[in-house]
Amino acid sequence: MDSGGRIVYALNVEKTGFLRILSVTVLQRLYRRVFWFLFKCVAGIDVPRHAGSLAVFSFFFLSILYSISSGGYMNHFMKVAISNSGFLVTHVDMSGNKRMMEQDILKVLGLDEYPSMISFDIDKARFILEQQPWVRLADVQKIYPDRLRISLVEREPYAIWQHNGEMNIIDDTGYVIAPFQAGLVQNLSFVVGQGAQKTAKLFIQALSVYPQLQNHVRAYVRVGDRRWDLFLANGMRIMLPENGAIERLASFIEQGVAEDLFSRDISDIDLRLSDRITVSLSDEALTRRRAVVLEEERLLKMLKAGSV
């Protein structure tokens, strides 16, 4: 106690307690002001009568929706909802699909599950279809309430292309449609070599004016992506020049010796030089030719021996 009768406390002990009491008082006063401000803000708002019920309903609805989603039942729920709404795809009309099976089309478009007319994307469906090997163009239309119309323009197989040990079916532009399988296509031209797929159509069309030759062709072989060799059904090879191949063939055919040469035991006919035709005998013909020559030489020796 000091001289004035007041109790004196140690500053380093009681100062902290005093500040705590002061801060509590200030905070309580601050809380009251904030509460009073918020009360004045909402005091003028007219709360609807059923706001509480709506809040409770929203809470339960969101809880059920979360349970369906987390439990993995959303797909089934969507299927039932779409079906009950009447916008479920129930009819799919298809046209132009000769090579691509109907069930394959339904599968790649996801129409084998629970398609919705509303959510079905026709642009995406068209893109997916045009990525299929046999499809060149596709058109997809919605016909409400429950029908889709799919029209396809498929690629036409033009030839069988052999290259690098592989055999593929190509169209007339050289586009590779699919790997070759026996029985999948019939009566197609057979082209061989790098670059043959791009130039085969023009060459085969140009050669079609000479059916007496083309009917015997078994394979069109592209050599060095520069020129063509023709392999005939009898095993004969016709070697064509790099430039003016069709004109050279025309001259050869018009000379009237083609049919005669085709019936002989010849392995190669070389037309690469414009001023001559070079012919190579087959192995069998060459063997017979050598036998004939040897026999003639033997007879000649016998005649000479008899005359002596």
Swiss-Prot record:
Its main location: membrane. Keywords: Cell cycle, Cell division, Cell inner membrane, Cell membrane, Membrane, Transmembrane, Transmembrane helix. This is Cell division protein FtsQ. It is found in: Cell inner membrane. It comes from the Bacteria. The chain crosses the membrane at residues 54-74. It is a single-pass type II membrane protein. The gene is ftsQ. Signal peptide: none annotated. Essential cell division protein.
